[in-house]
Amino acid sequence: MIDVMQIQKILPHRYPFLLVDKIVELKTKQIVKGYKNISISDHVFMGHFPDHPIYPGVLILEGMAQTGGVLAFESMDDKVDPSSKVVYFTGIDNAKFRNPVRPGDRLDYEMSVVKNRGNLWIFEGKAFVDGQLVAEAELKAMIVDK
């Protein structure tokens, strides 16, 4: 497992934009599973929507992307200092949102490698709440120098 303190050593994101709390499974160049606990105190619920809080789909995608970023960094053949690199997401295809995510939910991310060539990555991403699919997308990324 990779806790949030270790995640912050891999990814440049910080509160309020660090959207993965823990990595619970990681098989290099294959799959990563992580999650974010969704809380009513998350700043986004002040405006989305005050009387009907729904976690925004674009933040679900960003959480998936960050989870995939951990997998990409941890899968690099030549281990580099993550502080000198950054993962840029270059494309999102076939994004679908199946069910709303609400405060109190645990949002589980699952990112599988579809293709990897050098610093280029294609992931199949899925997000679940209580085992039910809430979102899915294909995400494309590349690792570049800062």
UniProtKB/Swiss-Prot annotation:
Keywords: Cytoplasm, Lipid A biosynthesis, Lipid biosynthesis, Lipid metabolism, Lyase
Localization, UniProt: Cytoplasm
Keyword Ribonucleoprotein tagged: no
InterPro entries per record: FabA_FabZ, FabZ, HotDog_dom_sf
EC code(s) of this entry: 4.2.1.59
GO cellular component terms attached to this protein's record: cytoplasm; membrane
Residues annotated as the enzyme's active site: H48
Signal peptide, first to last residue: none
Top-rank taxon, per record: Bacteria
Pfam families for this protein: FabA
One GO term of the biological process aspect: lipid A biosynthetic process
MF annotations from Gene Ontology: (3R)-hydroxyacyl-[acyl-carrier-protein] dehydratase activity
Catalytic activity: a (3R)-hydroxyacyl-[ACP] = a (2E)-enoyl-[ACP] + H2O
SUPFAM superfamilies: Thioesterase/thiol ester dehydrase-isomerase
Gene3D superfamilies for the chain: Hotdog Thioesterase
Chief subcellular location: cytoplasm
Family membership noted in the UniProt record: Belongs to the thioester dehydratase family. FabZ subfamily.
Function in brief: Involved in unsaturated fatty acids biosynthesis. Catalyzes the dehydration of short chain beta-hydroxyacyl-ACPs and long chain saturated and unsaturated beta-hydroxyacyl-ACPs.
Name used for this protein in its record: 3-hydroxyacyl-[acyl-carrier-protein] dehydratase FabZ
Taxonomic path: Bacteria, Pseudomonadati, Campylobacterota, Epsilonproteobacteria, Campylobacterales
